[in-house]
């Protein structure tokens, strides 16, 4: 009997395998599936806007080489972020700001806002304050929002000023040098966002004992996702939300 349900699904950068990642069109695609749970990435632009993009530069997604931190949000919005997209997409998709993404998302149920590793304590402080400002402006709630990062120094900095829940993003790079659960707890995190390969039965048991909910990334095989939910995962971050929905509909509990 399957354990995976629609409620477990979180769209990765929108729906990365089915629509251009981290774009307004991609997020609309996710909403049109009836999914209002999303993971996305933000960076600071030159003019301190929170822009939604995964990489520190624009080459992979737009075909144009610009450093996000050295480019204004207005100039980033002139680029078309469908360059890497593997599916047909009829319209251009500019790099959006976080405000543009969330100001039109009326029924948001859950969002993981991921901050990529930052270079210095000074930049961490700036990011933490700008993120807090934008979260307040957007009226983001602790019921819907988690600030996530693999940069645990940033998490500690942000946690000092931002009351929203925080989550540690952990993969082999962290797990090889430290216990992800201990790092999450020492960083004041409320969620462990774990690479699914690390979610063994022993890890699942340890997370339960630590009372630490787990969100797994990036799971694109439905059988694996179902197994992870059986082990206790609270949510599954996937590039293929529509494909997962179809499987769930064909395998009712």
Task: Give the predicted meaning of each segment.
Residues 1-253:
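Phosphate-group recognition and catalysis centered on beta-loop-alpha active-site segments
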